[in-house]
Amino acid sequence: MEYEIIRRKETGYSVSVAASKVTSFRKNFNETTTVRAYENGCIGIAGAVGKANLSALKKEAAESLKKGIAYPCNLSGGVRHDPAPKEILPESGIVPAFRALLEELSKKADGYLFGNKINLSYETVSYENTAGASYTSHDASLEYALTIKDKKSANIMDMVYGKRAFSYKKDAVVSEVLEMIAAYENPVPMPAEKLPVVTDAGAVAPLLSHFVAEMYGSGASLLSGKMGQKVFGDRVSVLVDRNPPYTGRFFDAEGVVNPEGKFYLVKDGVFCGALATKRSAQLFSLPVSGTAGSTYDGVPGATFTGLRFENTAEGYAAAGDAIFVVYASGGDM
């Protein structure tokens, strides 16, 4: 019988903001342990929240093999333990730092109200298996999700400042928010000519589901049957990148580590890969993409973690005139 053991610890801080003021501060700590047992082409899973009894979880996972859930084992070895990142902000300094940020934003953009949340998290994940693998990764990040409301507007909000950062730089945040507000205050007519559109990959998330192996293999994807064909323009490359800053974890939930941390779905316009776990890869004769994720007590499934478009220009200025989509939502999406 073969085993996988995954341990995850996360400390999270959440600062709530309303009317440009810090209104609450919350801290939480989550710890989970997952054990997967493999035998005779089946998987058994056991998970625990909080401190775990590893022997009991192994026994429970072995017992759950009786459910007969088919899943390939295909374990591989390897050792890598990344060092922990530097602390972004000390716990005692989180609220003062964001109060100072909001005070400066209120002074420099006094016609606007800021709200919603700023989150800070530290995560450590370890993976080991009976084939000799032993991995540890750490992630420390700030998530800004600030709504911006024009005081003269009847809207609930008029803009959103969203950003994932790995260090706290107040001046940079203020500069970026003011740049966004300056653009909002300077409406221009939509150009008649065709221009590149610059946006976050999240804006096209519904299209990304067509890369999932189950959709591709079942014939439900727009890409079904087109593996190896050129279906996009020459400059389009889409890849899973598990290197910082795209994701802090170099391995996925199945312990897969891609060469150089990358796996291409589209390379120079050619469709060359799908988002495949070990099970879907075996089912549809596809390469494993290294993008598996799972709940602490669930079967692995494909995720979009680390998915990005490869840069075609060194910075926005090099791309020339373009339409920049900062935020989009609603039924028309």
Feature roles, as predicted:
Residues M1-F251, N258-G261, K267-V270:
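Active-site bordering "gate/hinge" segments
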